[in-house]
Amino acid sequence: MLGGLPDLRLGLHALALVAIVQLLLGRWRWTTACAAAALVCVALRGPLAQAGADAVYRHKHRIAGAQVLWSVDSPYQRVEVVRAPGRGMMLYLDGLRDLDARDLDALNHYLARVPARLMRPAQALLLGNGTLSLVPELAALSGSLLTVEIDRAVVDAGVRFFTPAAPLAALTNWSLIEADGKAFLAASARRFDLIVVDLPSPLTLGEAYLHTREFYALCRSRLRPGGVLAV
């Protein structure tokens, strides 16, 4: 993990290895040498991981001066926040760019501002948008807003780098459910005036099943009469 609390797993593994060496050999000289080597590995792990992550984006993705500020392996994907001169913050999911901070205003406009201003929905549902960038705009124009996002790591990255936590905490008409959007639609009987879908492009199997006729039929079934689906 980069950009957060240190990953202690390597240190624990190193301690366990040193203990095994001592138990098997019973020689403090060997144990001391192994302990010193383990300390060096643990100390170098962070800088080497940072350099490697930066190199991937600078050379493979050809982003000059790229720096990985946040890298977490969630149960669903690798979540990374990358910063580059002249480009600001970018969100990558499994190495694929999901969001560029420069595009946030346009994204907020056509996905949230336009439909919500036209409708002023009493009940609005936001599927995805783990960075929560659409939440303040939608909440201000809706009676109540529910966000359904499956990956907590994306939410954490969003609050830390894209959408300040303080304004979100002040919202009294917004709630967040950590769940799969399709499963939520299938299990819930709630209906909404506006459903906004902000999901990654179907470039991997994990996202492809959210871009199907079945998924959009579920969305339609959860709309109130005259309701709108924004994609």
Predicted regions span which residues?
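Alpha-helical transmembrane segments of multi-pass membrane proteins
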Residues: M1-V231
